Amino acid sequence: MSVFTHLSLSPINIAAALCSTKAYNTAYVKGEQMINETMYARGAESSIIREIFSYGLERKAQIGAENVFDFSLGNPSVPAPAAVAESIKKALELPSDQLHGYTPAPGLPQCRTAVAESLNRRFGTSYEGKDVFMTVGAAASLTCTLNAVTNPGDEVIVIAPYFPEYRVWIEKAGCTCVEALADEDTFQLSVDNVLKAISDKTAAVIIDSPNNPTGAVYTCDTLTRLANALREANAQRDPENPIMLISDEPYREIVYGAEVPWVPSIYEHTIVCYSYSKSLSLPGERVGWILVPNTNPQAARLMPAVAGAARTLGFVCAPALFQRVIIDCIDEPSDVEAYARNRTALTNALAEYGYTYVEPDGAFYLWVKALEPDANAFCERAKKYELLAVPSDSF
């Protein structure tokens, strides 16, 4: 029997484990401390978004939060639904081992089923709980998915401008990040540019709709043309190695009248990554999911690969408490009204002052053209007025 099987129950096993390590103590040789230079560089060069956000926290502490206008980090400005607090209160009555104990790695079965059933109600699908893998938010969903569908040396296409962490996660998976520019006038995905970016090394394409940072919502026509283009590319490849479409959807619920197409119904080789950070205003709680649709021809191999990636990356399980919250709040509507009012107020004022922009159809960002060539200099000067914005070259 493994020493660790009943470690919490048997002091004899603990003693045995401690004794068994003595022989190894003399095997260590003192040498120079080594660090991973890539990780050092990533940590030393913190995200410009996080850097501006941290600066904002300092200024708020110095002059008061009401005097700082922080448009940096994507923190929802609306509170979580009241049902979230009610669910937490209910969960706190559970026995400690149920409330705080580990869940199965893919998530609580009842939570996975709740997600699948919610998707079925909304999109007319036939998913099951086993098609859902609960994660520590969208970042974990993306990193697990990337590591599941790629091999070192592969290429992953992103639609520029894009969330800057995509490159970090792609490169950590040993892959090359390849940019395909969006249409400059509408920020719709450019199928022609994606086609130009495809090579025999392409393993996946990441799309983000509603888009961060532009607010564009990709139309059904755009996505259908993309799907057809990917199928044409797949026809020249090993049928067991199609190009995967990774649909990153943390902003799906935050739209202003636009329709967000359900991508797996358009392209069969799709994996969906989702987070409740925006829809339920829970960014600090880190809970989301990966959907491997049962309509994906590679599903039988993809889900074990996702589980293996989560294990390898050190994601033990999604937060137990908030999996229970998701069960209770799965169909709670997002409060889009406040974002819609902000969008109207900002766009009206910016237009009055001579700024140009593409009006966002979703998410809660505004991509504005500065009135000068250097966006970094513009954002730096804006700090004098306690206005914090992120320069576009960060994306």
List the predicted regions and their residue ranges.
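Short, surface-exposed loop/turn segments at secondary-structure junctions
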Residues: 98-103
